[in-house]
Amino acid sequence: MSVNPHTVPFENTPGVRATDDISRHLADLRYPLHLSFKILALASQATVTDATGKTVIYTKQKMFKFREHVEIFTDKSKATQLADINASKVIDWSARYNSTDASGQPIGSVGRKGWRSIWRAHYETFNPGDDIPDFSIREENPGSKVMDSLLGGIPILGMATGYLFHPKYLATRTSGQAVMRLTKVAAFWEGRFKVEKIGELSPREELNLILSFLMLVMLERKRG
């Protein structure tokens, strides 16, 4: 039986290129992670830090493009690129967002689950080489997201929504096993989220889900 090398422990997959780079980058990661967006920035900028304050990911999305393109760096210096995310087609509801590492090797992809995502966020994440989703990301408390979106656009009042409503998103395997959760946390002037790892993941799966959560937050912000 063939085995997808991206879903098993990395010490058992010596043939996967660039795997060691990702494994080393995530080796000393301490959860929970903290994802922050600069709401007032002209471009979409996001930073992911771990529990020790170490920067894990920094991105500044390219603006005014017909097709989504997000460059992922290891820190704000942008000296080392960790990954690249590109939309499979011109921006629409069915677009898939494909992640590759610095050498061009696939990390995985994420996309909205059809029309269900209009009312309740539902995304699917795929490991490289898989045609069926390996993970499902669902909004756990959609009412909170609706109120956060409705009030977030109201001057002054919108500043307080970060303290009142905390949308949560849970990533599960097809078996139903929960592996990672994203929760919006209280903050003024920026969007802040907490990422908790609650299940076993290979390093590439782990990065795939972190990037999937990153894209989810960016896309949900645009959706309102």
Q: What are these language model-derived features?
A:
Residues 2-224:
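Intrinsically disordered, low-complexity proline/glycine-rich segments
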